Amino acid sequence: MVSVADATAPSGAIVVEDLHKRFGKLEVLKGVSLQAQQGDVISIIGSSGSGKSTLLRCINLLEIPNDGRVWVNRELIRMRKLRSGEAEPEDSKQVDRIRASLGMVFQSFNLWSHMTVLENVIEAPVHVLKVPRKLAIERALALLDKVGIADKRDHYPSHLSGGQQQRAAIARALAMQPKVMLFDEPTSALDPELVGEVLRVIRQLAEEGNTMLLVTHEMRFAREVSSKVIFLHQGRTEEEGTPAEVFDNPRSERIRQFLKAQH
């Protein structure tokens, strides 16, 4: 992959500066900033509607921010303003390159239903990265073994449990060898008894030093795996710090109320 890092860019795997996002007249993000260094695991917490998922979707350009700047691996995503006040990316090839470097795992799995688990995992490496099919299969089988579903390689998603589908989705994201993993509430659509198997995989990825941004309602898990926790409230960063700072010594009343409601 071509490296186009800017020597003057702020250091970090992901840097977000003063990000704003509006849907019509509703401003969902009101100037959010964050910085993730290589190997950081940042959990983004907050009530529903606080802007957590929108923030992740703006980072990989599934949503286009209205204002602010985003650097991925020290490469600034170039945007241009439209007369309408909206913005759009300047370079579609840059968007493709940025997205290929970010692994995204959604709460709803988003597996292709007409493909087997193995076919889901090799699809993007073969067609986007142009990895030889034999090598892509080899890597995919190793990833399916890593997430504990190697025996499901020839199954279709509809034949898997929710936890197995989400682990397949994680393997699919990892198959692109991303620089950063983005998890958007990866356990919220799962039955309670299946949550643990997905969290174990994410914990392993954290322990291996992967850079990750994790939107989650699993407070105990966030405390255990995160290097940093960010609490969003009504589209703004209300609190930010280490897990000990945020969970044990929160400064704002809003996060105290939020954490109390989680028990």
What are these regions (language model features)?
Residues V2-G12:
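Extreme N-terminus of proteins, especially the signal/transit-peptide cleavage junction
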Residues S11-P243:
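ABC family nucleotide-binding domain
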Residues V2, F231-Q234, A244-H263:
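C-terminal boundary and immediately downstream tail of ABC-type ATPase nucleotide-binding domains
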